[in-house]
């Protein structure tokens, strides 16, 4: 992922320049290390999705573009597990969901299988 950057509309406009599916992590920096508090994805436009978080408690973000909505879903699932979502270490309350039209499975835990 690219970043971390300050979570503001101006910075998102400057750094996230393509309309694309993608993934992101929200958090803060402590001792020069990015601390992940929330992971997410956008199936169509990662910049628009990030802007929905402006004004929340999160100070910074990292992001990456994805090649497809499915790739974004799979990466969000991996991030959720890698950053401790199942142990409550991130603010995500539930496992990432898939779009209603999709029959995708989580690459880590095979939920929805």
What are these regions (language model features)?
Residues 1-36, 41-113:
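Boundary/linker segments flanking structured domains
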């Amino acid at each position: 992922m690219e970043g971390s950057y300050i979570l503001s509309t101006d910075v998102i406009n400057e750094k996230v320049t393509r309309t694309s599916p993608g993934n992101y992590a929200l958090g803060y920096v402590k001792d020069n290390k990015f601390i992940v508090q929330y992971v997410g994805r956008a199936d169509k436009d990662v910049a628009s999705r990030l802007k929905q978080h402006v004004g929340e408690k999160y100070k910074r973000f990292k992001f990456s573009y994805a090649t497809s909505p499915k790739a974004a879903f799979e990466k969000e699932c991996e991030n959720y597990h890698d950053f401790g979502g199942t142990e409550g270490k991130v603010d995500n309350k539930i496992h990432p969901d898939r779009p209603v039209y999709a029959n995708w499975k989580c690459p880590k835990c095979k939920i929805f299988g």
